[in-house]
Amino acid sequence: MAIFRSFWQAGFEGADFITRAGHPLSMDNATAHDVRYAEDYRALMPFNMHTVRESVGWRLVDKSGSYDFTTVAKKMMSAKENGIQICWTICHYGFPANLDFFSPEFVSRFAHLCGSLAAFLRPWYEEPPVYSPINEISFTAWGIAEGLFPTTPPGVGQSELVKRQLVRAAKKK
């Protein structure tokens, strides 16, 4: 059995973070994919693409430990209607601003989000779902260490510590 429904896959840019200038940036919103996802999915049909990568947006769905998966549900409903398999990226550069990046809570809170998301999505899938816990761990670590993705406390110049924290979060069960 193939893991993916189609060889070719689409990806909708879902980076979601606070810029170094302190401005929230959701690429899902900036590209209007957050409101055009059904149209975007239908546009894939002539190309025989039935697999897409989407981002959950940890910063957007996390309400201090409870979650608003409204957007996730809407995209899943549209994906089902259009025969699309979604592979979810859970953290795409961004995380809640009120979270100390280097604390153990970062790891446990991310694990809680992952578990809650998997439980929420379970009824939507007939086949095993595909998840990417943290998008591009090396690039994310570099971006934090260079100050592109600000953290509290600052992670500038601490690329090894940053990467270790991201790996701890991604592998926590």
What are these regions (language model features)?
Residues 1-29:
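N-terminal small/glycine-rich loop or linker at the start of catalytic domains
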Residues 9-11, 17, 30-32, 51, ...:
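Glycan-recognition patch characteristic of GH18 chitinases/ENGases
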Residues 24-30, 100-105:
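Short glycine-enriched, charge-decorated loop/helix-capping segments at active-site entrances
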Residues 30-57, 78:
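Catalytic domains of carbohydrate-active enzymes, especially glycoside hydrolases
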Residues 56-67:
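Glycine-rich, proline-tolerant flexible connector loops at the mouths of alpha/beta enzymes
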